[in-house]
A protein has these predicted regions:
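Core segments of cupin and vicinal oxygen chelate
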Residues: 2, 9-50
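Vicinal oxygen chelate
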Residues: 4-13, 32, 41, 59-121
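A short, local hydrophobic-aromatic micro-motif
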Residues: 6, 30, 66, 90-91
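Short amphipathic alpha-helices in soluble, non-transmembrane regions
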Residues: 20-25, 80-86
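Short loop segments at secondary-structure junctions
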Residues: 46, 73-75, 109, 120-121
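Conserved beta-strand in the GNAT
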Residues: 52-55, 114-115
Length: 121
């Protein structure tokens, strides 16, 4: 079963500036990774709620929400279920070394990107 929202990825014109803005709203830096060159993960101060993953836009990308990711316990099973239900544009599952997670990306009927994610730890 697909669980709660794990994270919301935002592509910003300046990741550091966006992370500082979220800190002003009460979010705390969870970790910084080399994902997308440099990425910040921020969580609510009370730990209750999804993370924001922030990175600086590259190339022809434009600032905005890149995707919303949902936590899962068994990514292989959920990916297979999505394929059987003919969900569009499934890519994955695949492991991302820089985050220690396995992800599958897919799109909604309007082409927006969604993701399921499983911690590998």
């Amino acid at each position: 079963m697909i669980g709660e929202i794990d994270h919301i990825e935002i592509e910003a014109s300046d990741a550091t500036e966006m992370a500082d803005f979220l800190k002003k709203l009460g979010y705390e830096e969870h970790r910084e990774t080399e994902h997308h060159g440099q990425s910040f993960e921020l969580s609510p101060a009370d730990g209750d709620g999804p993370l924001f993953e922030i990175h600086t836009v590259e190339g022809e990308e434009v600032p905005g929400i890149n995707h919303i990711a949902f936590a899962v316990d068994n990514i292989e099973e959920i990916t297979e279920d999505l394929e059987e239900k003919e969900v569009d544009a499934i890519v994955g599952p695949y492991h991302v070394d820089k985050t220690g997670r396995t992800i599958t990306n897919f799109r909604d009927p309007d082409g927006r990107r969604f993701q399921i994610v499983q911690d590998d730890e």
